[in-house]
Amino acid sequence: MPTLILVRHGQSQWNLENRFTGWWDVDLTEKGVEEAKAAGTLLKEKGVLPTVAFTSFQTRAIKTLHLALEEADRLWIPETKDWRLNERHYGGLTGLDKQEMRDKHGDEQVHIWRRSFDVPPPDMEPGHQYDPGADPRYDGIDVPTTESLKLTIERVLPYWESEILPVLASGETVIISAHGNSLRALVKHLSGISDEDITGLEIPTGQPIIYQFDDRMQPGERYYLKDS
């Protein structure tokens, strides 16, 4: 039975500091490292052992994958990195303190920027100190200046359909180590969650989420591996 494992990266430094992160490359905290290791230990204990891995271009997701795979004795499996699994781009909010933004713009406006389905934050201006456009990992990529969840879905789902789903359909156990919003995009699709309801879905850091697929590649109900 094809099995999909979704893992949001462990706590990052900007998660800890309550800052908008998006495409900026931020490392894991010590807690984030431990969360990633614990995810791998759980995979091993439950016997849910990945055979193929996918992750983003961002360090926090890549490290989470490697730390988890090491704990599960699966560092040797093939892995693919792709920018389309990156976090949602938070535009001009990148690097800013979330509470300071609430104080400045009000809770409602910040909630709309963070959680609405199709309203993106303000664009990132050229020369912004956290502009990832000059990063060599994005050579040849048309880096967005901002993204809503809807726009994030529009890059994640074609990648899922063309690159990940065929691997899963061949019978592999696939692990995807990614980000809160790129994983929300997948969960919305796989679980048939409405545009309205997806805004309330939280993906916790370092907690493996499992989908099992039937012979017609229809996913069952998602569940947290720790609860199985």
Swiss-Prot record:
Binding sites annotated in the UniProt record for substrate: 8-15, 21-22, 60, 87-90, 98, 114-115, 180-181
Pathway annotation: Carbohydrate degradation; glycolysis; pyruvate from D-glyceraldehyde 3-phosphate: step 3/5
EC numbers: 5.4.2.11
Keyword annotations from UniProtKB, A to Z: Gluconeogenesis, Glycolysis, Isomerase
Pfam families per the UniProt record, alphabetical: His_Phos_1 (PF00300)
Alphabetized SUPFAM superfamilies for the sequence: Phosphoglycerate mutase-like
Gene3D superfamilies: Phosphoglycerate mutase-like
GO biological process: gluconeogenesis; glycolytic process
Task performed by this protein: Catalyzes the interconversion of 2-phosphoglycerate and 3-phosphoglycerate.
Subunit structure: Homodimer.
Family to which this protein belongs: Belongs to the phosphoglycerate mutase family. BPG-dependent PGAM subfamily.
The protein's name: 2,3-bisphosphoglycerate-dependent phosphoglycerate mutase
Source species of the chain: Erythrobacter litoralis (strain HTCC2594)
Gene: gpmA
